[in-house]
Amino acid sequence: TFTAEFIIMSGTYNFFPSKDFNSWRLYFCKSLKTLWSKTTCAMIFNLQTSDQEKITDGGIVYTSKEEIENFCKSNFGNVKAVINPAIPKDVTFVIKKWS
């Protein structure tokens, strides 16, 4: 097993080879819970967001920013969503184990 101060995932959860959104959500949630147990400082990841959760024909996952924030708050504590106005659908989530 390993531990790390920071775990950063860029693009990791933006593609899924199936259009089954529930399967993606299970994979995503299980993965974050596993990685959270291995970080000592913070976990950072990005997702594509949309008002309607979906997986496109090309496999790109769009999820709800609010749903992700709620999941992270209830499982890990405080979460910060960072949005760059130049790419507003790409949201970076930062979850710290310390203040």
Label the model's feature ranges.
Residues 1:
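S-adenosyl-L-methionine
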Residues 4-5, 41:
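Conserved acidic residues
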Residues 5-25:
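A short SAM/SAH-binding and catalytic strip from SAM-dependent methyltransferases
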Residues 13-15, 48-53:
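Short "lid" loop at the C-terminus of a central beta-strand within the Rossmann-like core
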Residues 22-31, 61-65:
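Charged helix-capping and loop-helix junction motifs
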Residues 31-49:
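Conserved beta-strand signature within the Rossmann-like core of class I S-adenosyl-L-methionine
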Residues 59-80:
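Short alpha-helix
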Residues 80-99:
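Core SAM-dependent methyltransferase catalytic element
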